[in-house]
Amino acid sequence: MTGDELRSAFLRFFEKKGHKILPSASLIPDDPQLLFTVAGMVPFKPIFWGKVEPVYTRVTTCQKCLRTNDIENVGRTPRHQTFFEMLGNFSFGDYFKKEAIIWAWEFVTEVLKLEKDRLWITVYEEDEESFKIWKDIVGVCEKKIIRMGKDTNFWGPAGPTGPCGPCSEIHYDTGLNEDCSDGECTPANSDKRFLEIWNLVFTEFYQDEKGALYPLPRKNIDTGAGLERVASVVQKVESNFETDIFKPIISKIEDVLGVEYKKDEQKDISIRVIADHSRAVSFLIADGVFPSNEERGYVLRRILRRAVRHGVLLGAQKPFLHLINETVIEHMGNTYSELKNRKDLILEVTRAEEERFFKTISQGNEMLRDIISRSSKVIDGEDVFKLYDTYGFPPDIVVDVAKDYNLKVDLEGFEKLMKIQRERARSARNNVEYAKSQEIYDELAQKSKTVFVGYDTLECEAKVIFLKKSGTKYEAVFDKTSFYAERGGQVSDVGQIVWDGGSASVEHVFIPVEGIIVHIINVEKGELKEGTKVRLIVDREKRLSTARNHTATHLLHAALRKVLGTHVKQAGSLVTPEKLRFDFTHHKPLTDNELMSIENMVNEIILRSIPVITEEKSYKEAVAEGAIALFGEKYGDVVRVVKVHSFSEELCGGTHVKNTGNIGLFRIVSESAISSGTRRIEAITGFNTLNYLRVKEQLVGNICEKLGTSQDEILSKIENLIEKNINLQKELQQFKSKLLVSQLKQTPFEQIKNIRFVHCVFNDIESNELRNLSDIAVAGENSTVALLFSTSKDKVNLIVRVTQDLAKKIKAGDIAKYAAQILEGGGGGRPDFAQAGGKDPSKINSVIEYTRKLLEQN
């Protein structure tokens, strides 16, 4: 049975048991507590919590999942993976333990035809009900039902809070010989021999942030069986990587990198890492994640670069992973159409990140080799930080390389140095106050909703339904509002609230849970209470400016796709009253002609004064008509579509102008890279464009005045000044060089026996200048040793020269290595030429004295 056949058999089996087959959800969960979908139940958490009523009470899925908590084990064990597929069947208040257990046994014994005598069961030690079902109804021998503790047989939650419950696992006896200290081998004492193939979770509790358990409104079933793991049992192979799921990928790796699997265990580790990581990279990019230095993007970058690093260990000298990804897409694209639909994007982003990392490797490897050469047992955290800060060299790769040299890495020291950079938005995810606030709004959403009327009006009458003090401000919820909440990259409205005897300013608006709109307000006068009737007034000018920029963002997106190609996808955006910022997937900088074409195209649509149409329709209908849906966004059955004739059509809940002519004028002010494969354009519209052009015009006028020229002559004037400056710089450099040579020649040398010893200290000169001076120091001389230093406040560089007649007995490289120790740095080189560097210029005399004694001994 192939992996594809196994997947299909599982889904069809449960379909016959009354389950609805649902497609896999995205790897990007709609859950603020999780970076990725880590289990099959994640998409159903709101149902398990009792917050959302299920459309179907019985569901079965094959869910794509990603976990990186054990990434260092991937490739080193037969089972560990980052990306995997989770087979699962779910019941939402329908059947419970009895049916789940009976059906699981039926599937593994009758469909998969696994030998019953090889199957063992574990149950939670306090779950007597499950024990009896396995023993009395299914008929499993009592000695093969093992009671286990909470650490192994109580599942969840998937995050700090959430649904959880006892679980029962099916284990397969692989028959491997293993000494078990407790007597007979069982799943309780033998991880290697017994392979867990299916976990049946009986979800009946909710765990809060303190760890307290509360019964859920309904009892649920959540089961999970790793497709790759089950396939290894069915196909009777020792490793997930030997199944037909991985074979085409490993075969491609062999072809591309010229290696052979199962010939060398160290190489096999790297092959397995690449095979696993290529799947993770392909699916992450397909689901809208792009390499970056934070959150999901950082995880993708880490996985991708780890795969490349293992490719380098196998001899790769140029980008190769995108070629492996092609096989992933070909092999899995029929099951997961997003791979084929986004093939070009996956390959382009992968290749661009590979190219960037190969540059990083070549720069960082030299520094890493130097670090390893002077590290006896531990690589210092400061060195790891320098590698990351200077070259973007990932710390996990330093750890991998360190293992090859039996070195440890001071990751704790690295983390301390990284603290400032790492204090990002993720801290909010684990914030207890944030979790408490979420619970409050979850409860409020069960009783009340905020109706948004802001598409049609900027002012409305409303009633306060919830009020909470938050520092010096308040969080206020109304039964309806005209204020747009921050969402989809658009900032929230601001404005005023007035009521009888009072007023407040609205500073920010957000949506903590669906249906609740929270206003951050500053009470300026009077007292506001729950139940108070108020009037909400949106700042008209800021709303209109934001609307101009939002519609312009849609036009920019469409123009980018028309000029650059349909591989362009939105990777992020920010829409404010002042400007718009649009991040998109593209592998190289835009040319001046491309930018001009895009800008002209957008302005042409603006000048044509085309109506901007907004309408609601079904999601399927909108997508079928060609409307662009953004990766990672969650859409309901009914969506809002914003359309500009045949030029642009997107699913969007933001605010827009009624007519493109209302935008006025569109101007791109910058284009840059924010990460490999992702570009950013910033632009302005309306009066902001006019003000921008006025400032530019005034700046040009001021420059002309300073240079005493006209706008027509300004370019030639500047070119003349640049040429003069270059000539003056050359003259100045020549003068400086003469001074340095003069300083060197005027420095008296020491005669030690028959050896001419030259040593001279210069103040903060370039390394190439120091090298030139060292050439002069030994030019036309024999029996000469020269030490030339360049110092700055906390840095010293040294060049050591030894003439050829002395180089066999006095080696420049040895002097440099010793000098590096004294100067607290690193160094080395050839017998006739060597360099060293350090951070303690005060030790220069010690280096000179050491060399003097060395010469006296020869």
From Swiss-Prot:
Q: According to the record, how does the cofactor bind? A: Binds 1 zinc ion per subunit.
Q: Which GO terms describe its cellular component?
A: cytosol
Instruction: Please list the cofactors this protein needs.
Output: Zn(2+)
Q: Looking at its record, which EC class is this enzyme?
A: ligase
InterPro entries registered for this protein in UniProt: aa-tRNA-synth_II/BPL/LPL, Ala-tRNA-lgiase_IIc, Ala-tRNA-ligase_IIc_anticod-bd, Ala-tRNA-synth_IIc_core, Ala-tRNA-synth_IIc_N, Ala-tRNA_ligase, Ala_tRNA_ligase_euk/bac, DHHA1_dom
Q: Which residues bind Zn(2+)?
A: 550, 554, 652, 656
Question: Does the keyword section mention Zinc?
Answer: yes
Keyword entries, A-Z: Aminoacyl-tRNA synthetase, ATP-binding, Cytoplasm, Ligase, Metal-binding, Nucleotide-binding, Protein biosynthesis, RNA-binding, tRNA-binding, Zinc
Give the principal location in a single coarse category: cytoplasm
Its domain description in UniProt is:
Consists of three domains; the N-terminal catalytic domain, the editing domain and the C-terminal C-Ala domain. The editing domain removes incorrectly charged amino acids, while the C-Ala domain, along with tRNA(Ala), serves as a bridge to cooperatively bring together the editing and aminoacylation centers thus stimulating deacylation of misacylated tRNAs.
**Matching PANTHER family, A to Z?**
ALANINE--TRNA LIGASE, CYTOPLASMIC (PTHR11777:SF9), ALANYL-TRNA SYNTHETASE (PTHR11777)
Family membership, please give it.
Belongs to the class-II aminoacyl-tRNA synthetase family.
Q: Which NCBIfam families match?
A: alaS
Any idea what this protein is called? Alanine--tRNA ligase
